[in-house]
């Protein structure tokens, strides 16, 4: 029953997301982990710490499927964009922001905590932080073709 409820919820969220991206822009900031970390099964599935079963890690095949889905969406939807960041990133939290609306900050390490913020100045500060992290040029002038190629090259590296 829980599995069916979760699947129905997932389908509903996916459907709403696909409807929204026809009209609104969506940008994800991604750090590609070291390929060996992926092969060794050390890449954490986002938000898996929040579930009662503990942290869940991608298999190499699952991570490849995830990236292939991103590449497919970059090619199919003009309002979806990805900014790749280099260097180390803190994986203990995730930040979701909607400009002029609000921010969700989720601490993904144990114990998990989720904060929803809709105060105007805080939202603006997080928005500035995220656009700076993505790179102002990469954010304001996204190049989906270039990012799709970079992700495809990374996928080939994982498969080799």
Specify the residue positions occupied by each region the protein language model found.
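Hydrophobic protein-protein interaction segments
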Residues: 1-159
């Amino acid at each position: 029953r829980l599995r069916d409820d979760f699947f129905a919820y997932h389908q509903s969220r996916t459907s709403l997301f696909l409807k929204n991206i026809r009209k609104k822009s969506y940008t994800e900031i991604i750090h590609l982990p070291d390929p060996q970390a992926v092969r060794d099964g050390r890449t954490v599935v986002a938000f898996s710490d929040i579930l009662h079963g503990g942290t869940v890690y991608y298999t190499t095949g699952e991570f490849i499927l995830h990236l292939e889905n991103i590449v497919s969406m970059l090619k199919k939807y003009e309002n979806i964009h990805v900014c790749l960041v280099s260097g180390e990133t803190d994986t203990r939290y995730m930040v979701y922001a909607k400009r002029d609306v609000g921010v969700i900050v989720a601490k993904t390490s144990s114990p998990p905590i989720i904060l929803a913020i809709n105060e105007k100045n805080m939202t603006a500060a997080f928005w500035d932080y995220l656009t700076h992290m993505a790179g102002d040029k990469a954010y304001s002038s996204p190049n989906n073709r270039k990012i799709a190629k970079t992700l495809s090259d990374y996928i080939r590296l994982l498969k080799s």
